[in-house]
UniProtKB/Swiss-Prot annotation:
One of its GO terms (biological process) is positive regulation of double-strand break repair. This is ATP-dependent DNA helicase DDX11. It comes from Homo sapiens. A motif (DEAH box) lies at residues 393-396. PROSITE patterns: HELICASE_ATP_BIND_2 (PS51193).
Length: 970
């Protein structure tokens, strides 16, 4: 259908077809939020075209914003002077170009001529800035139109070259000093390629101030960042689907879009990509950039040059001229990550760095959560949020994502292994290291020793054979942990900065990679014990290569130094005392014991985003309870309540086309209670299997069944296999199980889809497929099981967290202490058992955390075509003391038995499913949902005209159904 322009109020929204009314409301509210610079929480259910509404609404605002900015600039440039603030366009003043130029209050009693002079000067300065900005924009647009191949940012290469020259001078000086001493023989041994493993001289504190000023001067040479929109989502597949939606939108041909990703996703160097581990890929990439300058530096020294090239070659794809070409190509036409990767291979340019070069001139930047929410990653990628717009999609798990991203866990074996490696490194190169390097290395060794001691172990013994006298879990504040570990006198900020600047973890990995198997035979006997200990912790390469090539085991193929991981724990210990806790988990042996930093206040990492950005939009299909975002994330980040705007809309599916059904008891009248105490009972697992057998017998196509956890799915699967229920299920549906490995998900889904298609054509005894999945896993979001792929979705129990978990209890206590209690009524959209203080019930915020976590983890339903009447099969009506309402308010539901579900599916519409409960069902009655779509081929007759799956368009209304094929995120 041709693109249409919808006018909502005075705003024109280009749209590829006639939008729903809720989409018009969505775009209008989004426009107002961006214009006013507020924080918006948008809730739009699955299947309502949320992505397209975000695209058209946000890009319409950006179009109008740039137009107003050009008009204002033209007016000021034409008159030469003018009011610096316009009432209508006050928000327009406009970008950083108008910062501080106007509205500066003058001291009272100042002469009028002084005030007039200052005002005129400010106006002239503003006009000069506008002229410069206009010239820069014109130059940028010309470059994009003509695709000129210019090499920019040469200062980066110059800077790296200077660093390498300094390092070479230091190494040459060290060799001259030692070549006549007792270490001369050993020095000759080091010249066979070990120079790259030696730490360069480290400067800190005042010594770094001069270098920082140089860095600031170089930063001025970077290209200016225009006003843009940063769109982020959880997975790369969701980002790819969003880019495809942008291509199909009316803005697809004009918008300048760039997709960002990790080195693991964008690397085109097969030698580097084959390393597998993300950390190893990152480190090798940086090392290869540095080695390209060593190659040039050693041109006149033939032998050293050959030795360095044999060890590590420069990356042929890191070429500024080719990356500039890739940048221009990426901005000239919308490309997803796969197209960017193909372009990089064709142009022999690095897509990772080429896409980063495109950020300043891009209007829409698409990136994963981690690159936006992690400050260090954001800074390294060159992302600047000042006065920009950020849209966070699929944000229902935003709080948990930030918490998990900044929580770090290290094991006793990792601590011992890092200590052993670092001690051998110091023994090997200690004579060549400067005093400041040795000081910091000894501090790191001391920290590792104390971390092991606080767990109750001995750093000098093998952690696999050490048994701890005390076991259990202990939780401490950060300060208490530092005092107990006796490391409160060490400046962790300096240690963290040293680890980052000196790249000690990278040097240490290179050292262990080189000498992991042969070092002990070449050293003195006193080091043989350390090397033997290291080998006992780290398997040989041949043994690792024989392991299965699973993603979960990818890191074991080429293990990175554990110091890389421990650096994250050291950085976490610099968090404010009240914002985190340290959990000491002492198990049977030291190797299994762990130290974990638990972030309690995710707002400290989100505060910088909301403070710098012009506007932030948090969107998702199910954002309830919204109060969690308001209180735990925004209020704690310093956002005023008046700045937060909420928007929520219903579904486009008519209520008579979707009907959730809750199964409270099984075939043998066994009550379904999937609590931690009862869900592992054999009769409970048997009852679930019998219910699924009956459902699979009458439901055509695909059935998707979600379990609360991988462990419970494993237990149920093993029990069914032992009791024969798995064979009964396999006779009706081919069974697929969600893999734990991410790279196997596509293979499983493809086989699942092909099986259903084949069964639909053959019409044999096997009528489809059954997919066993896990809530919060790789199938729970971002994938649409449309048409026959999702005829029935069943939820077994609810993914409540373990209430006895020390982490959860500490989070609950933190919320109780931090968030002010609200007497009387509970928060909207969440529950929690009231705690009575005197005669007044008080709903504790912490007691509501388990239900909020459960609600955010539950998967969204599979949305079926509007004319197909849908039903839901849910298991487990387990009672709960709270009064939460977890059910979507636009759905209706009924409590039925498995027999009634079967009768309905076979065409009997007079069963108890018509006893619909209120639209908001209390938690005691409704726990679980799954959608069963009636097959148009069977006796279930649709109440409206059937839509064509090919065009996905209602012939009666001409409105798109917003459904996408399997494999694409919503």
């Amino acid at each position: 259908m041709a693109n249409e322009t919808q006018k909502v109020g005075a705003i024109h929204f280009p749209f590829p077809f006639t939008p729903y009314s809720i989409q018009e409301d969505f775009m209008a509210e989004l426009y107002r939020v961006l214009e006013a610079g507020k924080i918006g929480i948008f809730e739009s259910p699955t299947g309502t075209g949320k992505s397209l509404s975000l695209i058209c609404g946000a890009l319409s605002w950006l179009r109008d914003f740039e137009q107003k900015k050009r008009e204002e600039e033209a007016r000021l440039l034409e008159t030469g002077t003018g009011p610096l603030h316009d009432e209508k366009d006050e928000s327009l003043c406009l970008s950083s170009s108008c910062e501080g130029a106007a509205g500066t209050p003058r001291p009272a009693g100042e002469p009028a001529w002084v005030t007039q002079f200052v005002q005129k000067k400010e106006e002239r300065d503003l006009v000069d800035r506008l002229k410069a900005e206009q010239a820069r924009r014109k130059q940028r647009e010309e470059r994009l139109q003509q695709l000129q191949h210019r090499v920019q940012l040469k200062y980066a290469a110059k800077r790296l070259r200077q660093e390498e020259e300094e390092r070479e001078n230091l190494l040459r000086l060290s060799r001259e000093m030692l070549e006549t001493g007792p270490e001369a023989e050993r020095l000759e041994q080091l010249e066979s390629g070990e120079e790259e493993l030696v730490l360069a001289e480290y400067e800190s504190d005042e010594e770094k101030k001069v270098a920082s000023r140089v860095d600031e001067d170089e930063d001025d040479l970077e290209e200016e960042h225009i006003t843009k929109i940063y769109y982020c989502s959880r997975t790369h597949s969701q980002l790819a689907q969003f880019v495809h939606e942008v291509k199909k939108s009316p803005f697809g041909k004009d918008v300048r879009l760039v997709s960002l990703g990790s080195r693991q996703n964008l690397c085109v160097n097969e030698d580097v990509k084959s390393l597998g581990s993300v950390q190893l890929i990152n480190d090798r990439c940086v090392d290869m950039q540095r080695s390209r300058h060593e190659k040039k530096k050693g041109a006149e020294e033939e032998k050293p040059k050959r030795r360095r090239q044999e060890k590590q070659a420069a990356c042929p794809f890191y070429n500024h001229e080719q990356m500039g070409l890739l940048r221009d190509e990426a901005l000239a036409e919308v490309k997803d990550m796969e197209q960017l990767l193909a372009l990089g291979k064709e142009a022999r340019a690095c897509p990772y760095y080429g896409s980063r070069l495109a950020i300043p001139a891009a209007q829409l930047v698409v990136l994963p959560y981690q690159m936006l929410l992690h400050a260090a990653t954001r800074q390294a990628a060159g992302i600047r949020l000042q006065d920009q717009v950020v849209i966070i999609d699929e944000a229902h798990n935003l709080i948990d994502t930030i918490t998990g991203m900044h929580s770090v866990e290290v094991s006793g074996s990792q601590l011992c292994q890092a200590h052993s490696q670092l001690l051998q490194y110091v023994e090997r190169y200690g004579k060549r290291l400067k005093a400041k390097n040795l000081m910091y290395l000894k501090q790191i060794l001391y920290l590792l020793e104390k971390f092991v001691a606080v767990l109750g172990g001995n750093i000098k013994q093998n952690p696999n054979t050490q048994s701890l006298s005390q076991t259990g879990t202990e939780l401490k504040t950060i300060n208490d942990f530092l005092f107990q570990s006796q490391i409160d006198n060490i400046n962790l900020f300096k240690v963290q900065r040293y680890c980052e600047k000196s790249m000690i973890s990278r040097k240490l990995f290179g050292f262990t990679e080189r000498y992991g198997a042969v070092f002990s035979s070449r050293e003195q006997p006193k080091l043989a014990g350390f090397q033997q200990f290291l080998q006992s912790l780290q398997p040989r390469t041949t043994e690792a290569l024989a392991a299965p090539a699973d993603e979960s085991q990818a890191s074991t193929l080429r293990p990175a130094s554990p110091l890389m991981h421990i650096q994250g724990f050291l950085a976490a210990l610099t968090t404010a005392n009240q914002d985190g806790r340290v959990i000491l988990s002492r198990q049977g042996s030291l190797s299994q014991s762990t130290l974990k930093f638990l972030l309690l206040n995710p707002a400290v990492h989100f505060a910088q985003v909301v403070k710098e950005c012009r506007a932030v939009v948090i969107a998702g299909g199910t954002m309830q309870p919204v109060s969690d975002f308001r209180q735990q994330l925004l209020a704690c980040a310093g956002v005023e309540a008046e700045r937060v705007v909420e928007f929520s809309c219903g579904h486009v599916i008519p209520p008579d086309n979707i009907l959730p059904l809750v199964i409270c008891s099984g075939i043998s009248n066994q009550p379904l209670e999937f609590t931690f105490q009862k869900r592992e009972l054999p009769q409970m697992m048997d009852e679930v299997g019998r219910i699924l057998c009956n459902l699979c017998g009458v439901v055509p196509g695909g059935v998707v069944c979600f379990f609360p956890s991988y462990e419970y799915l494993r237990q149920v699967h093993a029990h069914w296999e032992k009791g024969g229920l798995l064979g009964r299920l396999a006779a009706r549906k081919k069974i697929f199980q969600e893999p734990k490995s991410a790279h196997q998900v596509e293979q499983v889904l493809l086989a699942y889809s092909r099986c259903i298609q084949a069964c639909g054509q053959e019409r044999g005894q096997v009528t489809g497929a059954l997919l066993l999945s896990v809530v919060g896993g790789k199938m729970s979001e971002g994938i649409n099981f449309s048409d026959n792929l999702g005829r029935c979705v069943v939820m077994v129990g609810m993914p409540f967290p373990n209430i006895r978990s020390a982490e959860l209890q500490e989070k609950m206590a933190y919320l109780d202490q931090t968030l002010s209690p609200r007497p009387g009524t509970p928060r909207e959209g969440s529950g929690g058992e009231p705690v009575h203080e005197g005669r007044q019930p008080v709903h504790r915020q912490g007691h509501q955390a388990p239900e909020g976590f459960c609600q955010r983890s539950a998967p969204g339903p599979a949305i079926c075509p509007a004319p197909c009447p849908g039903q839901a099969a849910g298991l487990d009506p387990s009672p709960c003391g709270g009064q939460s309402y977890l059910w979507p308010r636009h759905c209706c539901c009924a409590e039925v038995s498995p027999g009634e579900v079967g009768l309905f599916l076979m065409g009997n519409h007079t069963t108890a499913w018509r006893r619909a409960l209120p639209l908001s069902c209390p938690l005691e009655t409704v726990f679980v949902v799954g959608v069963v779509c009636g097959d148009p081929v069977t006796k279930v007759k649709p109440r409206r005209r059937v839509w064509s799956p090919e065009c996905c368009q209602d012939p009666g209304t001409g409105v798109s159904s917003r459904r996408r094929k399997w494999g694409n995120p919503e």
